[in-house]
Amino acid sequence: MSGKLYICPTPIGNLEDMTYRTVRILNEVDLIAAEDTRHSIKLLNHFEISKPLTSYHEHNKDSKGSYLINKLLDGENIALISDAGMPGISDPGEDIIKQAIEHNIDIEVLPGATASITALVGSGLETAKFAFEGFLDRDKKVRRNQLEELKEERRTIIFYESPHRLKDTLKDMLKVLGNRRIAVNREITKKYQEIIREDIETVINIFNEKEVKGEFVLIVEGFKGEKTVQNSYEDLTEREYVITLMENGMDKKDAIKTVCKDRKLKKDVVYKQVLDL
């Protein structure tokens, strides 16, 4: 019988956020797989957890992933932890979880600390709908292309960012997304936690005057304007064309007018096709 893979979240800055259940599971499993064993051993020692520890990270995930799967298939129970927060979110834990599912291995995800949701809730921006993007690319051109794809995203957007790229990322956001509201979360739950709720331009000015330290979660307001209408509707019927324009924020009257002008049709020809809209 196969063992079970436990996904165990760890504190993102404050050790008091470690749950009783996580401590119990870590004490019960046969093996703990950690992103950085040097970092995790300190956490385990603090909670007096003395279980075998092995590394599982981006640079060894292929070979170590196979090793862990074989251990699980042999009946061992394994706990997966990351340096901070929920494994599988912007880290290689995603891969071992997929492999476990492919091998029909039971997986149990324990609830706990997650930087993205913690930052979102305290942002003051819309929380009903959001998009998690994680880290943007290091390359400036690729990063801007990624932001271009999100330019008209109406949901609140969550990003992770490192201190040495923060200023460049904020400048790219201002250029591509425009000067919208943002909540910049630094060192969440730690001693020097800071949340700046301003517009992007103001935040850039703030960090131009201070040293950038710590890890950041950026919560960016979703797009509030009218979406850009693409001119690639040749294959649509007049009715489909009108519906598409309306879905992009145009009212019915203007949509009909646009279709008539684009297709050189009389108004009544198009109007008859959309009477029920």
Mark where each language-model region is:
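Glycine-rich, flexible N-terminal cofactor/catalytic loop recognition
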Residues: 1-56
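Loop/turn-to-beta-strand initiation segments
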Residues: 3-5, 75-79, 155-156
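Conserved helicase motor
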Residues: 56-62, 136-139
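Glycine-centered tight-turn and secondary-structure capping sites
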Residues: 92-94, 252
